[in-house]
Amino acid sequence: MPLLRSNYNPSIIFKSGFFSTVYSGLFRHLKINQDRELIYLSDGDFLDLDWGYSNTPTKKVAIILHGMEGNAQRPYVSGVAKYLNLNNYDAVCVNFRGCSGTKNNKFFSFHSGQSDDLVQVIDHVLEKYSYEFIYLKGISLGGNIVLKYLGETSSIPTQIKAAMAVSTPVDIASSSNELHRFKNCLFHIYFIIGLKLKLKKKQRQFPSKISRLLLWRIWTLHSFDELYTSPANGFKDAADYYDKSNSLQYLPKINTPVLILNALNDSFLSETCYPYVIAEDNPFIHLETPKHGGHVGFILPGKTYYNELRAVEFFSKFD
């Protein structure tokens, strides 16, 4: 598939990747009506799903996955859901384990390769509802999960028509290295503070499995993955976790239409997160790499952001 030429051209102030990333995360506020549904998983844990609906009955639904240290209420998620609702799509925003405001039941939490939870969400939607068209949209870490699912799953349900991944670190190891660079120090601090707060709650929940000493040893995202994420989820170490969870290795196997939207000035992404060669060889992968946008920025005048417009434009081709 030829690489897509992007039409995204923001105003001067939003040509800065840093400012776009910060602005969209801190200064956007949305109102959206949603209903929460709790579903139980096969291992005894649960997920909270936040549903928003089209004003008219529809057979179309989008399943939306958030990023690291996010949840279904973040503006970059609810903005997508709201715009989809306005365009006759229902939208179900998934809160990963431990991200909905209620601690999950298990020692392990969510991670960037946890596509088996997405499988159970899809199965739930198929079994309980009568949608004929299902679309997937993953943002950042959620995008990696969507792409991994599409590439590793041998039999995709026929109702899944297309997908989109935004600001997605398809190569987790190299993106982790980018987050540890000085240019991302403020974001790195933000992420590790949030993750450690959750881990402290997990330590009180499972004191025999997490020592207070371990909490003091975690000061970086890599040490968090090395000392908690990896052992809690059955990986040998952080390198093994990154290797088995990254979606880059699965992209050649994808046979569902998917749009990958990664800005060139996204400071979280490494060079390998722009899979030009794979996209050229795989007719199902549409790769759009605008010059601007930052990490989950893509700001436009008005209330709707560029990645939200692109989701509706892309999905509507497969209705």
Placement of each model-derived feature along the sequence:
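Catalytic histidine-centered segment of alpha/beta-hydrolase-like enzymes
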Residues: 293-306
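Short beta-strand element of the alpha/beta-hydrolase
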Residues: 59-67
